[in-house]
């Protein structure tokens, strides 16, 4: 991934819902069109912006890190797709909640740092 978020923006890969439905006879079928409200507002953190938000002087302090799951407002950010994966870039202001997944890195990307 060559995209690095700036300011207090966050790059997330969207988490798709794997919702299943069970028929009266016990047959499990995956829904062709999962409920948008259950899948479109959740993502895994891929990268964190390192700069301050517009009009602010302090760099953001994230309570979550790369690899954690965040929940965000429905119409926040911009969406795009790369190599079959759906991504979204959102502002820290639009994050509503998060789930920690073990020992994740919560620091920001350092200015001028080279990505592998």
Swiss-Prot record:
One Gene Ontology MF term: protein folding chaperone
SUPFAM superfamilies: GroES-like
Subcellular location: Cytoplasm
Domain of life: Bacteria
Sequence intervals crossing the membrane: none
CDD domains reported in the protein's UniProt record: cpn10
Keywords: Chaperone, Cytoplasm
NCBIfam families in the cross-refs: PRK00364.3-2 (NF001536)
Function: Together with the chaperonin GroEL, plays an essential role in assisting protein folding. The GroEL-GroES system forms a nano-cage that allows encapsulation of the non-native substrate proteins and provides a physical environment optimized to promote and accelerate protein folding. GroES binds to the apical surface of the GroEL ring, thereby capping the opening of the GroEL channel.
Quaternary structure and interacting proteins, as annotated: Heptamer of 7 subunits arranged in a ring. Interacts with the chaperonin GroEL.
HAMAP family tied to this protein: CH10 (MF_00580)
Protein name listed in UniProt: Co-chaperonin GroES
UniProt source species: Mycoplasma pneumoniae (strain ATCC 29342 / M129 / Subtype 1)
């Amino acid at each position: 991934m060559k995209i690095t978020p700036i300011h207090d923006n966050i790059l997330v890969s969207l988490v798709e819902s794997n919702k299943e439905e069970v028929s009266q006879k016990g047959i499990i079928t995956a829904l062709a069109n999962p409920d948008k409200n259950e899948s479109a507002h959740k993502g895994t953190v891929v990268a964190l912006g390192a700069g301050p938000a517009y009009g602010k002087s302090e760099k953001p302090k994230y309570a979550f890190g790369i690899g954690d799951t965040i929940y965000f407002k429905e119409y926040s950010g911009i969406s795009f797709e790369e190599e079959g994966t759906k991504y979204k870039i959102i502002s820290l202001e639009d994050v509503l909640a998060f789930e920690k997944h073990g020992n994740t890195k919560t620091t920001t990307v350092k200015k001028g740092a080279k990505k592998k």
